[in-house]
């Protein structure tokens, strides 16, 4: 009986793919070696310990319908589109060894005619006249009895969008999360014009089989077909939830300030696990009462745009004369925290 398992996702949904990865990892026998191949539509994927408000231009992501997905491994933020091929290698201990999976990916690239090297920062690079350029980045996760190595290969990614979504607005944000390190990157199409996702998947699959000396049929996974994945619905619900993607952010503080025609406003938020634990409001408005009430109302609320807007709207009944100011404040906050 083979010890290998090959899964290929037909879905471009990042929450679906990460939930599949999590289910397989939790439930695989410790003797199994797994390769999972997948790709995501427009998504910023952040590391387990990262702060999305610090790492990402969340306002632009929302405008462009780019999803946020938090993975279970560490490391930095990356932008995925259909120009990326994603891979995950899993194995039980003591056999799990990220140097083996790195070797498999390098062998796959070599079979396609690309000579790449492993760098010291979990990346694969190619040498160009302009210096080393990154074509693959990886992250890792280990538990007591198993581990996985997952990463991306840049095929034809829109590298301009990479900068758009991973360069955050200049916010006054003091945060404790892990900050992503930017790298010089290159697409494989610059080296192999016309290379496709299917060709790369085939090369990685063949290198995987060659390393272990076994072959196995691929299992194609889609939202309509999730074989042998107990508890998938619960895992997907968690992976796609605001509480996981935003609420798991490390504690941080956010200072917002603006001057309106009716006065200046300064907001100080302390946020833990996506919830406002302290809200301080300072203003030179001639009528500070609605703003003081807002500070009290926001304490304990989720740090999300719709909640902030609802808090302002709920104060209009209590302070009808300040309806215009409260709606102006709500619109500004909605832009400032995205």
Curated annotation (Swiss-Prot):
GO molecular function: ATP binding; lipoate-protein ligase activity; lipoyltransferase activity
Subcellular location: Cytoplasm
UniProt-listed Enzyme Commission number(s): 6.3.1.20
Gene3D superfamilies: Bira Bifunctional Protein, Domain 2, CO dehydrogenase flavoprotein, C-terminal domain
Chain residues that bind ATP: 71, 76-79, 134
Residues making up the signal peptide according to the UniProt record: none
Domain BPL/LPL catalytic stretches: 29-216
Pathway membership: Protein modification; protein lipoylation via exogenous pathway; protein N(6)-(lipoyl)lysine from lipoate: step 1/2; Protein modification; protein lipoylation via exogenous pathway; protein N(6)-(lipoyl)lysine from lipoate: step 2/2
A GO term from the CC aspect: cytosol
Known catalytic reactions: L-lysyl-[lipoyl-carrier protein] + (R)-lipoate + ATP = N(6)-[(R)-lipoyl]-L-lysyl-[lipoyl-carrier protein] + AMP + diphosphate + H(+)
An example Gene Ontology biological process: protein modification process
Keyword terms, alphabetized: ATP-binding, Cytoplasm, Ligase, Nucleotide-binding
Residues binding (R)-lipoate: 134
Described purpose of this protein according to its UniProt entry: Catalyzes both the ATP-dependent activation of exogenously supplied lipoate to lipoyl-AMP and the transfer of the activated lipoyl onto the lipoyl domains of lipoate-dependent enzymes.
Subunit structure comment from the entry: Monomer.
Matching PANTHER family: LIPOATE-PROTEIN LIGASE, LIPOYLTRANSFERASE 1, MITOCHONDRIAL
Family designation: Belongs to the LplA family.
Further comment found in the protein's record: In the transfer reaction, the free carboxyl group of lipoic acid is attached via an amide linkage to the epsilon-amino group of a specific lysine residue of lipoyl domains of lipoate-dependent enzymes.
Record's protein name: Lipoate-protein ligase A
Organism lineage: Bacteria, Pseudomonadati, Pseudomonadota, Gammaproteobacteria, Enterobacterales
């Amino acid at each position: 009986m083979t010890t290998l398992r090959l899964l290929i996702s037909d879905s471009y949904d990042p929450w679906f793919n990460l939930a599949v990865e999590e289910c397989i990892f939790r439930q695989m026998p410790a003797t199994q070696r797994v390769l999972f191949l997948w790709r995501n539509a427009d998504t910023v994927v952040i590391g387990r310990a990262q702060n999305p408000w610090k790492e990402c231009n969340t306002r632009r992501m929302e405008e462009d319908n780019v999803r946020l997905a938090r993975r279970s491994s560490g490391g930095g933020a990356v932008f995925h589109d259909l120009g990326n091929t994603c891979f995950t290698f899993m194995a039980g201990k003591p056999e799990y060894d990220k140097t083996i999976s790195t070797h498999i990916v390098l062998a796959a690239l070599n079979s396609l005619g690309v000579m790449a090297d492993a760098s010291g920062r979990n990346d694969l690079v190619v040498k160009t006249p302009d210096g080393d350029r990154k074509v693959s980045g990886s992250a890792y996760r280990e538990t007591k009895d198993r581990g996985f190595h997952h990463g991306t290969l840049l095929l034809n990614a829109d590298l301009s969008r990479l900068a758009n979504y991973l360069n955050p607005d200049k916010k006054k944000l003091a945060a404790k999360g892990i900050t992503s390190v930017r790298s010089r990157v290159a697409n494989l199409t610059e080296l192999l014009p016309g290379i496709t996702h299917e060709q790369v998947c085939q090369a990685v699959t063949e290198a995987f089989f060659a390393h272990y000396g076994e072959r196995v049929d691929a299992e194609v996974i889609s939202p309509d077909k999730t074989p042998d994945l107990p508890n998938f619905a619960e895992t997907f619900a968690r992976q796609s939830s605001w509480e996981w993607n935003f609420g798991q952010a490390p504690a941080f503080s956010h200072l917002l300030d603006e001057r309106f025609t009716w006065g200046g406003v300064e907001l100080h938020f302390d946020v833990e696990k996506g919830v406002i634990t302290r809200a301080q409001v300072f203003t030179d408005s001639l009528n500070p009462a609605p703003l003081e009430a807002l500070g009290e109302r926001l304490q304990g609320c989720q740090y999300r745009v719709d909640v902030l807007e609802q808090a302002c709207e709920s104060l209009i009944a209590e302070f009808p004369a300040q309806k215009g100011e409260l709606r102006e404040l709500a619109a500004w906050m909605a832009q400032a925290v995205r």
